[in-house]
Swiss-Prot record:
It is found in: Secreted. Its main location: secreted. The active site is at S44, D347, H350. Keywords: Glycoprotein, Hydrolase, Lipid degradation, Lipid metabolism, Secreted, Signal. GO terms for cellular component: extracellular region. It comes from the Eukaryota. It comes from Arabidopsis thaliana. Residues 1-26 form the signal peptide. This is GDSL esterase/lipase At1g28650. Its EC number is 3.1.1.-. GO terms for molecular function: hydrolase activity, acting on ester bonds. The keyword Aminoacyl-tRNA synthetase does not apply. The keyword Glycoprotein applies. Belongs to the 'GDSL' lipolytic enzyme family.
Length: 385
């Protein structure tokens, strides 16, 4: 009897050890991956050329011309910056090529990355926004359109790869944006009230969440999901709401109530991502804190190599912030600074390469990601960009 109990106890102990070992190994494998590709969705913050390719050749957007791209790409690549974006610095760190835009690309391999992000894109469909009285004239390539396009071409992507579809997605870092910012930008710039705009928050969060679930069902395992920016520090927003009565933070010069709105979106997004993580424990859903990774640059610009005037645009003209709505970067009579690396803001709406590099470093080293990336399987790694 004693022998039987002893054997049973040993068997139970062995099974428990095996169980917990399996859990640890599975967790380790889901955390640290040698990503073989990047799949990207979003708007101009991640657009590597889609909007330019989608545009009429006789009416190309400003990002198709200098000074866009003047710090790195020569000629312009269609990125809304003077150079590289966060997605580019992540690709460099992973040893992958810059992620090519899907739309308009010819004779391009997507085996190591594909990008559907489009300037002006929204999380919510254009038709829905129009019904709410919100104009969205830049593009109809919303998040759902990007995702459906990806689903349609997925069989072809897998056919050109040695991996099956689920394996391909599992080996990819999936970048979900930034997306949702334009859903707020349009109504803010159209004069909608803060209460009207707040009603969109749960709908936008749901759209992002639903897209993640769809990609999980297809085999996605690692998602980097950015939050919103501190829009109260945006050159364009500071110009839009520039009145004698508007309250500014005495330390940064930003508009507090706009930043609180961005924080509200981010808190709701984090709550949703936590719920998704509980539902899909085998998946790694990483929140990218774009808000604080950028806000620190406004708090201590000199510490990060920027001028002590971080709210002004490098490329622009007029006003307190070197920016005038309707007379913007790339247009006749609009100049740009000779040292973009000393500026946080590029064109009033978008950021400089130097800013995106600092943000990417903060994401990759884990300071601004929850949970932090685990790079232990890579051996040595460098976050300097």
């Amino acid at each position: 009897m004693t022998t039987t109990l002893l054997m049973a106890s040993l068997i139970v102990s062995f099974l428990l050890i095996l169980y917990y070992t399996t859990i640890v190994v599975a967790s380790s494998e889901s955390r640290c991956r040698r990503y073989k590709s990047i799949i990207s969705f979003g708007d101009s913050i991640a657009d590597t050329g889609n909007y330019v390719h989608l545009s009429n050749v006789n009416n190309l957007p400003q990002a198709a011309f200098l000074p866009y791209g003047e710090s790195f790409f020569h000629p312009p690549s269609g990125r809304y910056s003077d150079g590289r974006l966060v997605i580019d610095f992540i690709a460099e760190f992973l040893g992958l090529p810059y992620v090519p835009p899907y739309f308009g690309s010819q004779n391009v391999s997507f085996n190591q990355g594909i990008n559907f992000a489009v300037y002006g894109a929204t999380a919510l469909d254009r038709a829905f926004l129009v019904k709410q009285g919100i104009k969205s004239d830049f593009t109809n390539i919303s998040l759902s359109v990007q995702l459906n396009t990806f689903k349609q071409i997925l069989p072809n992507l897998c056919a050109s790869s040695t991996r099956d579809c689920r394996e391909m997605l599992g080996d990819s870092l999936i970048l979900m944006g930034e997306i949702g910012g334009n859903d707020y930008n349009y109504p803010f710039f159209e004069g909608k009230s803060i209460n009207e705009i707040k009603e969109l928050v749960p709908l936008i969060i749901k759209a992002i969440s639903s897209a993640i679930v769809d990609l999980i069902d297809l085999g996605g395992k690692t998602f980097l999901v950015p939050g919103n920016f501190p829009i109260g520090c945006s050159t364009a927003y500071l110009t839009l709401f520039q009145t004698a009565t508007v309250e500014h933070d005495p330390f940064t010069g930003c508009i507090p109530w706009l930043n609180k709105f961005g924080e509200h979106h981010n808190e709701q997004l984090k709550i949703e991502l936590k719920q998704l993580q509980k539902l899909y424990p085998h998946v790694n859903i990483i929140y990218a804190d774009y808000y604080n990774s950028l806000y620190g640059l406004f708090q201590e610009p000199a510490k990060y190599g920027f001028k002590n005037r971080p709210l002004a645009a490098c490329c622009g003209v007029g006003g307190q912030y070197n920016f005038t709505i309707g007379k913007e970067c790339g247009e006749n009579g609009v100049s740009y600074c000779q040292n973009p690396s000393e500026y946080v803001n590029w064109d009033g709406y978008h950021l400089t390469e130097a800013t995106y590099q600092k943000m990417a470093q903060g994401l990759l080293n884990g300071r601004y990601t929850t949970p932090a990336f685990d790079w232990s399987c890579l051996g040595s790694y460098d976050f300097s960009g």
